[in-house]
């Protein structure tokens, strides 16, 4: 296990930075993969949108693919996180193991080495002591032997007792000298051949020294020969009971005899070496015991040879106590702990480091003890372990670590010392605790600390990883979210695109049936045999249909604008008139809402501008209808003023200061303008500013920008309360932008919303468009009696500006007062001075008016000022009637003013009646009428009054503007719808401008007027037909194309046949051809062209005027067709090419044959293309009969058409 | 006899209505019928025949064009289908027209598979229509032969 981890660590250690790098690489890879999943998708995003649309299905797959990728990448983050954690765990684990291992191993190894040395040392020293003890003993023995030999040689062959005694005495002296010098000796014995024994002995117990000798009397001098050596034995010593032993105490220092020799029993004798111990004449070693000593003794024995060196004459024995070795061991162990003991080869204990006994007392006296029998438990068990482990074949050196004895661990080392003839085994037993105890403890602690630390680090690391990768995973989440969002957005875009595409493609399909429905309804309405109920229902249906058509048109417009296919018309139109009509229309709605509609156009507005009138009207219609929706009380003002593009720069600085919120737009405008100025310097561009100001609920400033988004409403709940799709403002903004302008909601004081927009329109070159009539010279005095304060104020301001004295009155009382003051001046000259309820400015005004000489009073009375709820109004009228000779009354009627009131007014001779609201143009009409009337004189006036009751005035009461076509027979709402309807319809025809708003009473008197009016009715009818070309073509129009020659170029046989039949049914003469080439050929322009110059040549002499007319007539006559219906897509030569060819051929001639395109496409872009190549109108397939008829008629009989209308 | 006529007339009405309801025909066909009067008694049949001839021609044209694997002339197919769309819308063959629109889209996106599929559908559709109209005309004829009047069918 440890080995494994070690090898692993060895492998990993140098690798570890590499490993982390690898990890990084892995992470990087994973990230790369993620980004890979994202990037192709991203690149897709930039791919062209068209491709997207075309490959909808494919993309959907891609979406799923991307989302699945996203999911898997999300998982991969999880996996990466896990992997990093595992890596961290492994790393920390390795680190821990390594740290632990190294700290432990190195310490352990060094300690082990140290311990080994220590143990060795420990053992070595007692052994060396042993050795030295042995050596000493041996040396002493040898010395004793040598000395003995010397003495014996000297007393060679003692013959006498004296000699012998002398010799023994000499021996005793010599021996004593030696004994005394060697303090460590326990005893020296000399055993002579004859049995005499001399011995010195130290008793450590009593610390006294003894001389021991045997009785000499029994020994012969001669002794036995060498041959008797074998007779020597120990018995002769111990067993020789005959011998008497003496023991004499000596002074340990001097060797003086301290007492008399005492007889001692042989049992108390010390060991005396005998001849038996030196059987081979060599030195021998023994371990012996003595009863005086508690430790074993080491005894050496050596023989002493005689001079001839042939026989042993004596045996010298030296005994040393091993006590000192044990002492040394104890000393050593005291320091180091543990146990040391020495045994003989047989296992007998020689010395131990303990105090325990080394001998055992047996009946035969003390005997050596085996180590295994030692009383010391450690030694005993150690010895037992050694014996058990190694048996009898114990190696010379044993080093055993971790030997478990009992519950402790020990080191056991054993050395075998082969001393001369005395092999010794030394054993050291040291508890492991003493050496490794600290290390083990520390290793354990280190391990614990390391493990806990690494666990901590691991957890911290995990937390860190989590925190660190949290960002990544968050990013992944966000990215996934983003992908989802983008996915959704793209879907939305795609669907929106599909929507636009679909709508664009469906435009025709949608509009045609609606037009048909409305047309059919018109037919139905014009039918006489409808019951009232049916009529009401049908009218309702028609309203609904027009509403639906309007909605459709809104959507289609939006899609058209969005798909960039909207083409704006460039045609002259009367801006003021359009707006007036619009306000007229909406005022009807407003009056219902109790809201005042005011049109306030500045005088410098150009009368005629070039642009798309329908779209312009649509803009304001949308804005105003929007305002009406949200305005319950108050007023809606449509303001307009104009800035000349060239003079704008000077004004800019001023206007920027004046209108802070408008400032950014202005700067934009400047850029725009600069651009414009560069591009078309000479074009007469005007910047027209408009404001639609209402007092409605207003728009929250935060939504000022978003209200212009499609399907966006300022407050979602408005859909519930007010309805609407939220498309209106979007269309408005798109249209305004298309016209080079901008629209914005502007901060306004007080309630409501103020929308400000500007448009850049070009004005026709005709100069002096707005000739303002000069009224100031007529001395007119206008009294405005209207209860709508805003309109009154604006009108009076305008009147004053033009030098017309104006008095305002807001209710009946005020009116009567002023009338009295002004008109009854004759009777009560200065009566107004006495009036106290007239305010000061009014008084000043009145006094000014009085000073005007011969004033003409015009009293404009709002019908609402009269009390119509009761019958008081009649009296009020009568009252006013009194002044009718002094002043001219003009009445402002509401659309719902009852007929009785009208009749009454008429009966009274008040013929100047206009519908509300009052605006500039109407005011001018009134004033002009008054002035004209004044010229005619008073008598006419009277006559006029007399004929007032004539019913023929009926038709006069409503101003026959061009809008009366809408408002004459329909209710208010229908008129509004029709207005929009009309404005949306691409009208190639322009409405003839009917200038009179007000039919003057004087003209109406003439018979011719009534005739013209009767004439007018069918005209209007006709006009209406043409205007709403899908509508009403009744039976009498069936043959409406009588006599018209039509060339039909159509390649599809079916269509050709159908169209032919259709046209022929309506009386037209049709020639069908199959392609463009045939069409061109059949026109035969070439011949005409060739003809024309020749004619020209012929008539060269003639007058030029004549010539031209001739040619023209000839050309007109020579043209075989009145009109061409041209299919756009045809083989050989398509419609466009054919038209171009025809138009080319027409160059240089006065001829222009109308060409109507037939196409299956229904977009304005196609229309634009058609018109571009020179076609005059455009019809879509399948052919709508009525539309076709009206188009053909408008093109073929333009003169008749116009003359009939512009009467 | 009268009962037979009435039965025939009812069948005619039902059949016509079913044709409208199933989307084979639309209002254009009604328009077409309105154009038919004493001066051109077989106008509808004539136009329809023209239409079917045209159809056959155009479809075979397209089939030929689409047959040339590799370099399909989508432009040719496009113009053919455009024509077909025009004529079918003029006749009031609603389904054929709808398919034409789809086919045109396929053609514009150069979707070969889609074109082929659509063309097959157009083929089927036009044949079905042909059969249906044949039945219708047969019914008409039967009514006329029985001495009855073709009833006006209001859709």
Curated annotation (Swiss-Prot), chain A:
It catalyses: ATP + protein L-histidine = ADP + protein N-phospho-L-histidine. The modification 4-aspartylphosphate is found at residue 1127. The chain crosses the membrane at residues 82-102, 447-467. Residues 505-763 form the Histidine kinase domain. Disruption phenotype: Insensitivity to ABA, but hypersensitivity to drought and high salinity stresses. Loss of seed viability over time dur to altered desiccation. The keyword Mitochondrion does not apply. GO terms for biological process: abscisic acid-activated signaling pathway; response to osmotic stress; response to water deprivation; seed maturation; stomatal complex patterning. Mostly expressed in roots, and, to a lower extent, in stems, leaves and flowers. GO terms for molecular function: histidine phosphotransfer kinase activity; osmosensor activity; phosphorelay sensor kinase activity. Residues 1-10 have a biased composition (Polar residues). One of its GO terms (cellular component) is plasma membrane. This is Histidine kinase 1. It comes from Arabidopsis thaliana. The gene is AHK1.
UniProtKB/Swiss-Prot annotation, chain B:
Disulfide bonds: none annotated. It is found in: Cytoplasm, Cytosol; Nucleus. Its main location: cytoplasm. Pfam families: Hpt (PF01627). Strongly expressed in roots. Detected also in flowers, leaves, siliques and stems. Interacts with the B-type response regulators ARR1, ARR2 and ARR9. Binds to ETR1, AHK2, AHK3, AHK4, AHK5 and CKI1. One of its GO terms (molecular function) is protein histidine kinase binding. Functions as a two-component phosphorelay mediators between cytokinin sensor histidine kinases and response regulator (B-type ARRs). Plays an important role in propagating cytokinin signal transduction through the multistep His-to-Asp phosphorelay. The modification N-acetylmethionine is found at residue 1. Histidine-containing phosphotransfer domain (HPt) contains an active histidine that mediates the phosphotransfer. It comes from the Eukaryota. Keywords: Acetylation, Cytokinin signaling pathway, Cytoplasm, Nucleus, Phosphoprotein, Stress response, Two-component regulatory system. CDD domains: HPT (cd00088). Signal peptide: none annotated. Residues 40-147 form the HPt domain. Two-component system major event consists of a His-to-Asp phosphorelay between a sensor histidine kinase (HK) and a response regulator (RR). In plants, the His-to-Asp phosphorelay involves an additional intermediate named Histidine-containing phosphotransfer protein (HPt). This multistep phosphorelay consists of a His-Asp-His-Asp sequential transfer of a phosphate group between first a His and an Asp of the HK protein, followed by the transfer to a conserved His of the HPt protein and finally the transfer to an Asp in the receiver domain of the RR protein. One of its GO terms (biological process) is embryo sac egg cell differentiation. The modification Phosphohistidine is found at residue 82. One of its GO terms (cellular component) is plastid. SUPFAM superfamilies: Histidine-containing phosphotransfer domain, HPT domain. This is Histidine-containing phosphotransfer protein 3. Induction: By salt, cold and drought stress.
């Amino acid at each position: 296990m440890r080995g494994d981890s070690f090898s692993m660590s060895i492998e990993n250690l140098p690798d570890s930075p590499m490993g982390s790098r690898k990890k990084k690489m892995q992470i990087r890879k994973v990230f790369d993969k993620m980004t890979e999943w994202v990037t192709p998708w991203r690149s897709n995003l930039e791919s062209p949108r068209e491709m997207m649309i075309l490959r909808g299905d494919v993309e959907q797959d891609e979406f799923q693919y991307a989302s699945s990728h996203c999911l898997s990448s999300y998982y991969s983050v999880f996996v990466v996180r896990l992997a990093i954690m595992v890596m961290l765990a492994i790393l920390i684990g390795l680190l821990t193991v390594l740290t632990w291992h190294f700290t432990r191993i190195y310490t352990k190894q060094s300690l082990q080495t140290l311990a080994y040395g220590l143990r060795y040392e420990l053992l070595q020293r007692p052994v060396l002591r042993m050795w030295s003890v042995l050596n000493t003993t041996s040396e002493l023995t040898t010395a004793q032997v040598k000395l003995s030999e010397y003495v014996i040689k000297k007393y060679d062959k003692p013959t006498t007792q004296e000699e012998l005694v002398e010799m023994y005495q000499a021996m005793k002296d010599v021996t004593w000298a030696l004994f005394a010098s060697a303090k460590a000796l326990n005893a020296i014995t000399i055993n002579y051949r004859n049995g005499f024994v001399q011995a010195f002995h130290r008793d450590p117990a009593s610390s006294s020294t003894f001389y021991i000798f045997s009785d000499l009397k029994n020994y012969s001098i001669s002794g036995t020969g060498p041959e008797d050596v074998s007779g020597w034995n120990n018995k002769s010593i111990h067993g020789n009971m005959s011998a008497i032993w003496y023991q004499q105490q000596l002074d340990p220092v001097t060797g003086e005899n301290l007492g008399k020799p005492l007889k001692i029993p042989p049992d108390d004798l010390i060991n005396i070496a005998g001849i038996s111990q030196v059987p081979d004449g060599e030195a021998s070693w023994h371990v012996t015991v003595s009863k005086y000593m508690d430790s074993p003794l080491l005894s050496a024995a050596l023989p002493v040879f005689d001079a001839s060196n042939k026989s042993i004459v004596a045996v010298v024995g030296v005994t040393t106590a091993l006590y000192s070795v044990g002492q040394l061991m104890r000393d050593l162990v005291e320091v180091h702990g543990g146990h040391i003991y020495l045994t003989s080869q047989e296992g007998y204990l020689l010395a131990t480091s303990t105090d325990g006994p080394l001998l055992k007392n047996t009946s035969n006296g003390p005997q050596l003890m085996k180590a295994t029998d030692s009383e010391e438990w450690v030694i005993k068990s150690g010895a037992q372990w050694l014996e058990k482990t190694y048996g009898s074949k114990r190696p010379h050196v044993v080093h055993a670590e971790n030997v478990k004895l009992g519950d402790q661990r020990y080191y056991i080392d054993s050395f075998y010392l082969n001393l001369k003839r005395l092999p010794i085994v030394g054993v050291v037993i040291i508890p492991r605790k003493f050496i490794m105890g600290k290390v083990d403890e520390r290793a354990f602690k280190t391990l614990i600390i390391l493990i806990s630390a690494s666990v901590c680090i691991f957890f911290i690391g995990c937390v860190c990883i989590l925190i660190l990768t949290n960002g990544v995973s968050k990013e992944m989440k966000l990215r996934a979210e983003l992908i989802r969002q983008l996915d959704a957005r793209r879907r939305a875009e795609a669907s929106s695109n599909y929507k636009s595409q679909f709508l664009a493609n469906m435009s025709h399909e949608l509009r045609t049936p609606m037009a048909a429905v409305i047309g059919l309804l018109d037919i139905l309405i014009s039918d006489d045999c409808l019951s009232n109920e049916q009529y009401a229902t049908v009218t309702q249906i028609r309203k609904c249909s027009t509403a639906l058509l309007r909605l459709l048109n809104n959507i289609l417009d939006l899609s058209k604008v969005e798909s960039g296919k909207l083409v704006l018309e460039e045609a002259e139109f009367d801006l003021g008139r359009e707006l007036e009509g619009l306000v007229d229309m909406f005022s009807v709605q407003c009056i219902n809402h109790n809201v005042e509609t005011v049109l306030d156009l500045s005088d410098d507005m150009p009368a005629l501008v070039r642009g798309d009138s329908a779209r312009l009207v649509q803009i304001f219609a949308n804005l105003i209808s929007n305002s009406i929706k949200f305005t319950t009380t108050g007023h809606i003002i449509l303001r307009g003023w104009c800035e000349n593009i060239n003079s704008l720069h000077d004004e800019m600085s001023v206007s920027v200061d004046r209108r802070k919120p408008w400032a950014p737009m202005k700067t934009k405008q400047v850029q725009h303008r600069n651009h414009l100025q560069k591009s078309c310097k000479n074009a007469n561009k005007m910047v027209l500013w408009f404001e639609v100001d209402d007092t409605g609920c207003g728009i929250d400033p935060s939504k000022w920008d978003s209200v212009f988004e499609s399907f966006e409403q300022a407050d979602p709940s408005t859909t519930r309360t007010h309805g609407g799709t939220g498309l209106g403002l979007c269309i408005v903004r798109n249209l305004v932008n298309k016209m080079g302008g901008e629209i914005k909601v502007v901060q306004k004081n007080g309630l409501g919303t103020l929308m400000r927009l500007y448009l850049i329109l070009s004005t026709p070159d005709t100069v002096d468009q707005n000739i303002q009539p000069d009224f100031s010279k007529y001395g007119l005095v206008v009294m405005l009696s209207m209860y709508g304060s805003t309109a009154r104020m604006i009108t009076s301001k305008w009147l004053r500006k033009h030098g017309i004295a104006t008095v305002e009155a807001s209710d009946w009382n005020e009116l009567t007062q002023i009338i009295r003051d002004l008109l009854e001046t004759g009777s009560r000259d200065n009566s107004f001075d006495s009036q106290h309820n007239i305010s000061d400015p009014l008084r000043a005004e009145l006094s000014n008016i009085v000073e005007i000489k011969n004033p003409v009073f015009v009293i404009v009375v709002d019908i609402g000022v009269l009390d119509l709820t009761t019958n008081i109004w009649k009296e009020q009228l009568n009252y006013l009637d009194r002044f009718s000779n002094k002043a001219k009354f003009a009445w402002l009627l509401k659309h719902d003013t009852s007929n009785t009131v009208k009749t009454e007014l008429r009966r009274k001779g008040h013929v100047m009646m206009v519908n509300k609201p009052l605006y500039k143009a109407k005011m001018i009409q009134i004033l002009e009428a008054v002035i004209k009337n004044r010229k005619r004189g008073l008598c006419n006036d009277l006559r006029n009054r007399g004929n007032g009751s004539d019913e023929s005035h009926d038709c006069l009461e409503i101003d026959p503007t061009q809008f009366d076509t809408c408002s004459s027979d329909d209710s208010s709402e229908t008129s509004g719808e029709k207005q929009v309807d009309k404005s949306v319809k691409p009208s190639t025809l322009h409405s003839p401008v009917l200038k009179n708003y007000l039919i003057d009473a004087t003209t109406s008197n003439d018979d011719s007027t009534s005739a013209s009016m009767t004439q007018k009715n069918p005209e209007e009818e006709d006009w209406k037909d043409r205007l709403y070309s899908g509508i009403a073509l009744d039976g009498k129009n069936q043959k409406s194309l009588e006599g018209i020659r039509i060339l039909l170029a159509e390649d599809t046989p079916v269509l050709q046949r159908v169209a032919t039949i259709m046209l022929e049914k309506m009386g037209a003469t049709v020639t069908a051809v199959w392609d463009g080439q045939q069409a061109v050929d059949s026109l035969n322009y070439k011949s005409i062209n060739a003809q024309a110059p020749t004619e020209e040549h012929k008539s060269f002499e003639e007058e030029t005027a004549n010539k031209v007319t001739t040619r023209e007539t000839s050309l007109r006559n020579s043209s075989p067709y009145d009109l061409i219906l041209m299919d756009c897509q045809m083989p050989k030569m398509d419609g466009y090419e054919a038209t171009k060819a025809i138009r080319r051929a027409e160059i240089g001639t006065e001829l222009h044959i109308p060409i109507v395109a037939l196409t299956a496409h229904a977009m304005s872009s196609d229309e634009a293309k058609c018109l571009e190549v020179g076609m005059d109108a455009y019809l879509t397939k399948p052919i709508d009969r009525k539309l076709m008829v009206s188009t053909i008629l408008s093109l073929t009989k333009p003169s008749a058409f116009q003359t009939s209308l512009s009467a | 006899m009268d009962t037979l006529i009435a039965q025939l007339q009812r069948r005619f009405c039902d059949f016509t209505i079913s044709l409208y309801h199933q989307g084979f025909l639309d209002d254009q066909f009604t328009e077409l019928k309105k154009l038919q009067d004493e001066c051109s008694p077989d106008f509808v049949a004539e136009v329809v025949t023209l239409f079917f001839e045209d159809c056959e021609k155009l479809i075979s044209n397209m089939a030929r064009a689409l047959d040339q694997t590799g370099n399909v002339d989508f432009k040719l197919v496009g113009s053919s289908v455009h024509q077909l769309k025009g004529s079918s819308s003029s006749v009031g063959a609603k389904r054929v027209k709808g398919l034409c629109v789809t086919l045109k889209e396929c053609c514009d996106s150069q979707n070969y598979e889609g074109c082929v599929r659509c063309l097959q559908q157009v083929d089927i559709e036009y044949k079905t229509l042909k059969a249906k109209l044949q039945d219708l005309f047969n019914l008409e004829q039967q009514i006329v032969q029985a001495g009855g009047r073709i009833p006006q069918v209001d859709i």
